[in-house]
Amino acid sequence: MATGGRRGAAAAPLLVAVAALLLGAAGHLYPGEVCPGMDIRNNLTRLHELENCSVIEGHLQILLMFKTRPEDFRDLSFPKLIMITDYLLLFRVYGLESLKDLFPNLTVIRGSRLFFNYALVIFEMVHLKELGLYNLMNITRGSVRIEKNNELCYLATIDWSRILDSVEDNYIVLNKDDNEECGDICPGTAKGKTNCPATVINGQFVERCWTHSHCQKVCPTICKSHGCTAEGLCCHSECLGNCSQPDDPTKCVACRNFYLDGRCVETCPPPYYHFQDWRCVNFSFCQDLHHKCKNSRRQGCHQYVIHNNKCIPECPSGYTMNSSNLLCTPCLGPCPKVCHLLEGEKTIDSVTSAQELRGCTVINGSLIINIRGGNNLAAELEANLGLIEEISGYLKIRRSYALVSLSFFRKLRLIRGETLEIGNYSFYALDNQNLRQLWDWSKHNLTITQGKLFFHYNPKLCLSEIHKMEEVSGTKGRQERNDIALKTNGDQASCENELLKFSYIRTSFDKILLRWEPYWPPDFRDLLGFMLFYKEAPYQNVTEFDGQDACGSNSWTVVDIDPPLRSNDPKSQNHPGWLMRGLKPWTQYAIFVKTLVTFSDERRTYGAKSDIIYVQTDATNPSVPLDPISVSNSSSQIILKWKPPSDPNGNITHYLVFWERQAEDSELFELDYCLKGLKLPSRTWSPPFESEDSQKHNQSEYEDSAGECCSCPKTDSQILKELEESSFRKTFEDYLHNVVFVPRKTSSGTGAEDPRPSRKRRSLGDVGNVTVAVPTVAAFPNTSSTSVPTSPEEHRPFEKVVNKESLVISGLRHFTGYRIELQACNQDTPEERCSVAAYVSARTMPEAKADDIVGPVTHEIFENNVVHLMWQEPKEPNGLIVLYEVSYRRYGDEELHLCVSRKHFALERGCRLRGLSPGNYSVRIRATSLAGNGSWTEPTYFYVTDYLDVPSNIAKIIIGPLIFVFLFSVVIGSIYLFLRKRQPDGPLGPLYASSNPEYLSASDVFPCSVYVPDEWEVSREKITLLRELGQGSFGMVYEGNARDIIKGEAETRVAVKTVNESASLRERIEFLNEASVMKGFTCHHVVRLLGVVSKGQPTLVVMELMAHGDLKSYLRSLRPEAENNPGRPPPTLQEMIQMAAEIADGMAYLNAKKFVHRDLAARNCMVAHDFTVKIGDFGMTRDIYETDYYRKGGKGLLPVRWMAPESLKDGVFTTSSDMWSFGVVLWEITSLAEQPYQGLSNEQVLKFVMDGGYLDQPDNCPERVTDLMRMCWQFNPKMRPTFLEIVNLLKDDLHPSFPEVSFFHSEENKAPESEELEMEFEDMENVPLDRSSHCQREEAGGRDGGSSLGFKRSYEEHIPYTHMNGGKKNGRILTLPRSNPS
């Protein structure tokens, strides 16, 4: 912080002088002064220096004002400021709420020098509510970083692409705008007007503004960055930002290239030079800057030079300055970097001060080293001072307690001594308590031209080291008697050393045992012990003082060793020694030992020290091979790849690979996979290599032992992205804090977790190759509890020695699992020198025809039309055969399928077909193994004779049915009479009912009554057909006119549904049945029935005309690339909310009418002329969108992509299952009617949803709609909301007309009476939803095998769904006949 302040203070006088020179040249283009860069902090005092500034030549930093309040800024405004040449930084300025008054005319930020790649930084401005830089038109270089501003809004309304050339590197996060809490209102919006220009970003066509009162200025595209006038006319090509007149370079607000004498120019003509990348100056201007800096000798100023037609602060790399003309000339060889020291000397008292001399080769002045502490000093000093080759003055080392050696001056070769310390000293060393070495004189050469040496009070620096320096530096004989103190230098060091020799060395893989010769000083009591030093040394170039300083930084490991017991007999004297433990295998260590002795009375210190020796530990077992990956490229081969061990612990010579075939689980033989609901087992072979990390499985979640969903570790890409994001933020903050004050310590955290949810499934499939490290075993244990019996030869392990990191294993059985063991070895013979094993499982690919049935299919025909089919099993299938599929058909009929389990096949040696009708049959069979289906056999033909041909059966055939018909008639008549008495006909007469007639086929309707015309009947003459609209379920749908069909309207546009002329009676009844269902519906958000024409042919049903067709087609037409796009943009959030509420209101009405839709989808919703969405007429769309349906087994078509899990699994349809479908409709609205679960087949969707899956969030989906979807897709039906609750959630954001027409706000929407809730189940009315006669109801209720499809509806619909902790009480049970294929 202090450093930055000093630099700014030093540079200010020079730049103020520059500003004065430019005042006359500024002209009208810049109305004020050119000011130097400013750092304004702590208070507002210096802010007034901006008052007359038009250009800030440098940066503007406003920061660290914690006591300012909003009223302090109200009278502050600097309208003259137009351009900042570097960057603008605002950081922790309290009370500042907007910049609109502070810098109302700031137009350009050039970004010549950036703040961490950013030209505009707004960081931790706690009170800033808006930027307000409404005249900012151009940021020439750099990006924008706006972060951690808790009150900052109006960010989404700024189109940064109009200000910057590229917005990809912008970083705008963690502001109030991120939380969607901002109510950004552009000028005119509150009054319903559009005053500001609108642009498209990320598909959003939005107005652009800086504040509620200032629009963002958007120039025509052809103007590019030149700007435009207030009328929108383009400025001159040399302008930047704005201008007052078009096509005039003297009327620009700022210049695109350079400014010269009141006009903008492309380049500076001679004799002018480019200065600061924006203006032109002459030679005298640049020369004045050079001389003023040189003469002032102030820190932080620059001695400007001329290079490439530019006036720049210093010569670039590879050039040096010619002092006569200030020109930069190329260097001959390496360029010296001369650093001129202010006041002739510089004191290095910290790493920070040393950094200021980084890169210097010549010091023009004297250096004083006075370092008393610090971290990692030796390395830091070498990095910053290691290139210094020459010092013109003197070198003084004073009270530097942290220094052990001067070897960090690794290139210092000359001390000139042009300036000497008092007493004529050019090298001065005083009171350095830990200095032990000057330089390694065997490798270093130093010359001192003038001056003497001074050494006093360096207690650990031996005199021999000083005398060696005298000889090398050429100063011997210059010193006087008292210049080198004999008593205070080296008085605490072992300077008269003897050489210790090692007598015994023994190694193992993690230990080294050392012994050395005994040593005793003249007084043996002076020996305190030995010090053993060792460290890893890949190369034999280590010196004793490498990396050492006196503050604890030491690259050596030091061990203190007590002296041995002294013996009077030298021959029996024990040799001291030490066992070094915990070493790394196969690693070279540098080792030396020296004595630790006391200070002697004779001022002489004795001691001994060994030379540095190098010892390597032995090899041992390597660590496990890394990342083994297996793939199968054929049915008989597996490719194995791996990486070398992380710790080879020796030279890896080879790898051992073992593999063994794994038996399939015999339990698979015992199960009957033809049973409904039993999942077919499957196995997959090892997939091809995708990357080196393909063995890692990046599932989003897994199930634990209790079957509960657990979060999985994040994928490598997620972790890498989070680490990069965290590192990026930390690096920026460190950079910011380094510039602003002091660098903070790096946090030990791993970074913030991503709060966004990353998973969409509640369950997980099987996992593929998994690698684990286990101890080596001689034979592989069998992992299956029970196995298919196979010969021991097939399962014997195989072994192979490999000399590289890959292997192709051949000769394997097709589609068979193998377990592979991999060991790394670093020696040829002993087995114990190999690593523990890494295991990987793999499976070969299936054989193409291995599952084909061998030989012909034979048959045998028995009585009662039973046929026994027989065939042979595949000889060598892919894994196991789990079932057989038999496909047979009678000539002229549909093909039928029969599943035969393996257990059943083993008993029958085939299967039996029973109850066959007479005729010619063909049959095909295929086997299903763990790998999938085999091929069908060739068809086999047989003939079943007519059962009537047997005379003895004629009587049974005739008499039996007669008895059955008689009994059946009696039962039906009794039931009919009973129900007739208990329940009179409804007001609409007999009724065929269906909860969704689309899935009730004609075969389910017993036609014992006909349609009876009523008040809905319309005369055929009143209907006029105009044009075809499309094909419906029963026939064509037309647009037409109807006269007098609605009271008060002479003629009404309607939709007319017809039935095909070839339709059967049952189809016509079903057609009218649909119309009858619609008669009971009178809701604005449900398509209305207007009338029926049942007299004559064809039958017509007249409906309300929905001008924009079905919702699915309408949404697709809104896609930008759609050919039939009506010119409307995609729906906004407000329009999505309106659609959702209208659909929910219609469904709430149907629910109140005890109607379960069962096929709610966008295709079944219709769009009216005023864009109101209504629930469709339940019959127009299934044939049109037939691909949206799926036939499951022998059932009718099912819309599986819209169905709830309980409907798919158990056939249960309730209002809760309709709510699930409503969530899918919301998904269709936000995705513009994409197909749900795109890329999955219907069978995959079926399994995915039943297993707990649901749809991903569409791109750019509003968070509010996403929340609604998730509410609808609760796996537990009881936890889903009701449609009334949905409308209640959205009611405050709907069109004002909604309450006038909605069911939600109507009198009809009332809670049921309390006595109705007390009904017992026996007393409840069984209400089928198909309008049918009573006889049809009775038959449906008593039909054999007619499994009913039940659903519940709660009367407690006004209780929020989040409180439904138990089952729904007092529910009404309604039974329906199961739908059959239509």
From Swiss-Prot:
Residues with Phosphotyrosine modification: Y401, Y992, Y999, Y1011, Y1185, Y1189, Y1190, Y1355, Y1361
Tissue: Isoform Long and isoform Short are predominantly expressed in tissue targets of insulin metabolic effects: liver, adipose tissue and skeletal muscle but are also expressed in the peripheral nerve, kidney, pulmonary alveoli, pancreatic acini, placenta vascular endothelium, fibroblasts, monocytes, granulocytes, erythrocytes and skin. Isoform Short is preferentially expressed in fetal cells such as fetal fibroblasts, muscle, liver and kidney.
Entry's localization field: Cell membrane; Late endosome; Lysosome
Superkingdom field: Eukaryota
Annotated stretches, region: Insulin-binding: 733-741
Positions of the record's site feature: Insulin-binding: F66
Impact after mutating L991A: Reduces interaction with IRS1 but has no effect on interaction with SHC1
Mutagenesis or variant effect for S635L: In RMS; decreases post-translational processing
Linked residues for Glycyl lysine isopeptide (Lys-Gly) (interchain with G-Cter in ubiquitin): K1079
Regulation of its activity: Activated in response to insulin. Autophosphorylation activates the kinase activity. PTPN1, PTPRE and PTPRF dephosphorylate important tyrosine residues, thereby reducing INSR activity. Inhibited by ENPP1. GRB10 and GRB14 inhibit the catalytic activity of the INSR, they block access of substrates to the activated receptor. SOCS1 and SOCS3 act as negative regulators of INSR activity, they bind to the activated INRS and interfere with the phosphorylation of INSR substrates.
Residues annotated as catalytic: D1159
Cytoplasmic side: 980-1382
Effect of R1201W: In LEPRCH and RMS; reduces insulin binding possibly due to reduced receptor levels on the cell surface
Annotated source species: Homo sapiens (Human)
Effect caused by changing I146M: In LEPRCH; mild
Keywords: ATP-binding, Carbohydrate metabolism, Cell membrane, Cleavage on pair of basic residues, Diabetes mellitus, Disease variant, Disulfide bond, Endosome, Glycoprotein, Isopeptide bond, Kinase, Lysosome, Membrane, Nucleotide-binding, Phosphoprotein, Receptor, Repeat, S-nitrosylation, Signal, Transferase, Transmembrane, Transmembrane helix, Tyrosine-protein kinase, Ubl conjugation
Residues listed as glycosylation sites in the UniProt record: 43, 52, 105, 138, 242, 282, 322, 364, 424, 445, 541, 633, 651, 698, 769, 782, 920, 933
Binding positions (ATP): S1033, K1057, E1104, L1105, M1106, A1107, H1108, G1109, D1110, R1163, N1164, D1177
UniProt protein name: Insulin receptor
Subunit structure, interactors included: Tetramer of 2 alpha and 2 beta chains linked by disulfide bonds. The alpha chains carry the insulin-binding regions, while the beta chains carry the kinase domain. Forms a hybrid receptor with IGF1R, the hybrid is a tetramer consisting of 1 alpha chain and 1 beta chain of INSR and 1 alpha chain and 1 beta chain of IGF1R. Interacts with SORBS1 but dissociates from it following insulin stimulation. Binds SH2B2. Activated form of INSR interacts (via Tyr-999) with the PTB/PID domains of IRS1 and SHC1.
Secretion signal, residue range per the UniProt entry: 1-27
Bilayer topology term: Single-pass type I membrane protein
Effect of K1079R: Increased cell surface stability
Positions on the Extracellular side per record topology: 28-758, 763-956
